[in-house]
């Protein structure tokens, strides 16, 4: 089933449109130049009902991204929150992946963005583990990419922008063609930045390390894991991380809304730790899934019921 050929509805500029009718013109500006921003959000089945995890944080980042790109979203944050709930609710989804996107219309061509209408869509559909259930249990193989992560002054790394993900796609395609599952990207100075679409953590001697958010996205799942790790008593250090530090780590894992908490078992042919999901990773992974699925009362404010 293609993404275009599905039953259901998509929130499109304030209206719930039939899925197959949610189309736009081939001369839409963002399709040609990549100037747009988006989010990846998840909803989970909880004992209280379907709940969107950290909805407000995602909506805030969407607006921050648009502001960085100088795009004016024609709706309030509350309206986008309610539209996100509606996209899940009206598709009768117990759990879902949600894609809000802000993009320019087809009022003109060329690099000047003046006079272009800003559109907003929000789609929601069922989507399981990003790299498969086995990856969550056994971990994945990672390859260091030959493609450098963006310099902070090239693509505005605090914005989750459409065009920036060309860099991610090139890195991921290279990794997969080389027999890996995911890429590890370095910043312009050669330090570890992130995966193609995930933040990275390593554990060494019981201390959890993660790169500073300079060349990587300030991930919402990353921030969630930092909170959970602190609550579990782990020492946390945000710093520059070298490639060889990853090689000799006891454990490593990726985080992201799509990837959730995915262990890394191998990097560049080198086994990480015991070559499987480590105990710290497993503990944080369980804490994360307990949190998003409402098995704990902690951080109830991060779970927004759709009904």
Swiss-Prot record:
Cofactor(s) needed for function: pyridoxal 5'-phosphate
GO biological-process terms attached to the record: aspartate biosynthetic process; isoleucine biosynthetic process; L-leucine biosynthetic process; L-valine biosynthetic process
Residue positions, PTM N6-(pyridoxal phosphate)lysine: 160
Record has Transferase as a keyword: yes
EC number(s) given by UniProt: 2.6.1.42
GO CC, alphabetical: cytosol
Coiled coil start-end: none
Record carries keyword Transcription: no
Tree of life domain: Bacteria
Keywords: Amino-acid biosynthesis, Aminotransferase, Branched-chain amino acid biosynthesis, Pyridoxal phosphate, Transferase
Spans through the membrane: none
Example of a GO MF term: L-isoleucine-2-oxoglutarate transaminase activity
Any Pfam family matching the protein: Aminotran_4
Catalytic activity: L-leucine + 2-oxoglutarate = 4-methyl-2-oxopentanoate + L-glutamate; L-isoleucine + 2-oxoglutarate = (S)-3-methyl-2-oxopentanoate + L-glutamate; L-valine + 2-oxoglutarate = 3-methyl-2-oxobutanoate + L-glutamate
Pathway: Amino-acid biosynthesis; L-isoleucine biosynthesis; L-isoleucine from 2-oxobutanoate: step 4/4; Amino-acid biosynthesis; L-leucine biosynthesis; L-leucine from 3-methyl-2-oxobutanoate: step 4/4; Amino-acid biosynthesis; L-valine biosynthesis; L-valine from pyruvate: step 4/4
InterPro entries membership: Aminotrans_IV (IPR001544), Aminotrans_IV_CS (IPR018300), Aminotransferase-like (IPR036038), B_amino_transI (IPR005785), BCAT-like_C (IPR043132), BCAT-like_N (IPR043131), BCAT_family (IPR033939), Class-IV_PLP-Dep_Aminotrnsfr (IPR050571)
PANTHER family hit by this protein: AMINO-ACID AMINOTRANSFERASE, AMINODEOXYCHORISMATE LYASE
Function: Acts on leucine, isoleucine and valine.
Family: Belongs to the class-IV pyridoxal-phosphate-dependent aminotransferase family.
Protein name per its UniProtKB record: Branched-chain-amino-acid aminotransferase
Organism: Pseudomonas aeruginosa (strain ATCC 15692 / DSM 22644 / CIP 104116 / JCM 14847 / LMG 12228 / 1C / PRS 101 / PAO1)
């Amino acid at each position: 089933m293609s993404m275009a050929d599905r039953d259901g509805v998509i929130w499109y500029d304030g209206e719930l449109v039939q899925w197959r009718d949610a189309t736009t013109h081939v001369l839409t500006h963002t399709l040609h130049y990549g100037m747009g921003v988006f989010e990846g959000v998840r909803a989970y089945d909880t004992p209280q009902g379907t709940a969107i995890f950290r909805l407000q944080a995602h909506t805030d980042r969407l607006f921050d991204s648009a502001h960085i790109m100088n795009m004016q979203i024609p709706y309030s944050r509350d309206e986008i929150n309610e539209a996100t709930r509606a996209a899940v609710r009206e598709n009768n989804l117990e759990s879902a992946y949600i894609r809000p996107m802000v993009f320019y219309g087809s009022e003109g061509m060329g690099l000047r963005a003046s006079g272009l209408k800003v559109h907003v869509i929000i789609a929601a559909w069922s989507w399981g583990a990003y790299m498969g259930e086995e990856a969550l249990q056994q971990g994945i193989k990672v390859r260091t990419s030959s493609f450098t992560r963006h310099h902070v002054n090239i693509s505005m790394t605090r914005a989750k922008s459409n065009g920036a993900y060309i860099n991610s796609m090139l890195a991921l395609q290279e990794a997969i063609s080389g027999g890996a599952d995911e890429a590890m990207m370095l910043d312009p100075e050669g330090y570890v930045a992130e995966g193609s679409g995930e933040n990275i953590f390593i554990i060494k001697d019981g201390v959890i390390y993660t790169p500073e958010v300079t060349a990587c996205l300030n991930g919402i799942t990353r921030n969630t894991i930092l909170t959970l790790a602190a609550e579990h008593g782990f020492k946390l250090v945000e710093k520059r991380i070298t490639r060889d530090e990853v090689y000799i780590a006891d454990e490593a894992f990726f985080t992201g809304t799509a990837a959730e908490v995915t262990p890394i078992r191998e990097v560049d042919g080198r086994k990480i730790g015991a070559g499987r999901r480590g105990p710290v990773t497993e503990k944080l992974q369980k804490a994360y899934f307990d949190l998003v699925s409402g098995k704990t009362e902690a951080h109830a404010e991060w779970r927004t019921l759709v009904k």
